[in-house]
């Protein structure tokens, strides 16, 4: 079994709920970036030992949260030594609007993985894009490069769409399958 770590920031609990579903599907460890943009003790060592790093951030104002960006900037010490070279990476984001410019955040996560000379794992699921599709369908938001989820601004984390949570779990399973291939 591969060591997979889901590192994420969540401002209101929605991105955390997605992170938990991805981690459950992947059999991964969760690593939360705190409200000040810091990892807990041992966090950098956990990432160094991982075979795959899954990154998650909410989309705020067209990009990742500042707390996630602080973590990303701090990873430049790892970049300098190419400590994450050839690791597997994947990413996810959540926003209140259906589009919400989530692709900008996902692209940011991809760029960060590329800076670290990593290999990216796509979502690997077809979108639910026919007339029969419902909000609780798998990959209703229609991501390809990574997981995109939507939480209405007045919805609590407990009210998240079942389809988004199931898509997150399936994404985690895919990450574990790719990581197992070595």
Residue ranges and their predicted role:
Residues 88-139:
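Short, glycine-/small-residue-rich phosphate/pyrophosphate-handling segment
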Residues 107, 143, 162:
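Glycine-rich phosphate-binding loop at the start of an alpha helix
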């Amino acid at each position: 079994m591969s060591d997979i770590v889901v590192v994420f920031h969540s401002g209101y609990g929605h991105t955390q709920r997605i992170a938990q579903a991805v981690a459950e599907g992947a059999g991964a460890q969760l690593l939360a970036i705190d409200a000040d943009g810091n990892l807990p003790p041992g966090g950098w060592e956990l990432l160094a030992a991982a075979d795959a790093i899954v990154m998650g951030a909410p989309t705020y104002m067209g990009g990742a949260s500042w707390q996630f960006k602080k973590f990303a900037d701090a990873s430049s010490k790892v970049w300098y030594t190419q400590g994450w070279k050839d690791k597997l990476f994947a990413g996810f984001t959540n926003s209140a609007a259906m589009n919400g410019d989530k692709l900008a955040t996902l692209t940011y996560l991809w760029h960060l993985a590329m800076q670290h000379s990593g290999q990216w794992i796509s979502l690997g699921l077809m979108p639910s894009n026919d007339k029969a599709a419902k909000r609780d369908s798998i990959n209703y938001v229609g991501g390809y490069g990574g997981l995109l989820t939507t939480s209405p601004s007045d919805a609590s984390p407990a009210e998240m769409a079942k389809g988004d949570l199931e898509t997150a779990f399936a994404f985690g399973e895919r990450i574990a399958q790719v990581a197992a291939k070595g």
